[in-house]
Amino acid sequence: MSGRRAAGARSTAGDVRLRAVRLIAFRGANSVAANEAGAILDATEVLMHELLGRNGLETGDLVSCLFTLTPDLNAEFPAVAARRMGLSRVPLMCAQEIAVPGSMTGVIRVMIHAYSDDRREPVHVYLGETAALRQDLHGAQ
């Protein structure tokens, strides 16, 4: 299988027009002010809203989300924020980043797998201090 599928879009006449879609990975990160549940949830919610909004994604497009946190963040699971946003039918997983000496701390990262228009290029989103991680990306702001 090629990793592509067709999604139907109904016209007003009732016929179905197919558009090509493919499975795409969308990346993003946000900085967290403190190792507190509220700070982790707020940063995650902002990150998810930005990623979904900038890429025109809806809940039904999502296949899965993988969240990671730097080792200094352990007060809450980022998936809790995603569930509160209505992603209750999307498989979510949380993991800890590798503790690389000198790496940025206080960071939540996410990789979203979603079906999107075949012609659309993913917009990766890096917010707050994490914009320094991927200055090569136009969406890193």
Predicted regions and their residues:
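Terminal domain-initiation and capping elements
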Residues: 1-141
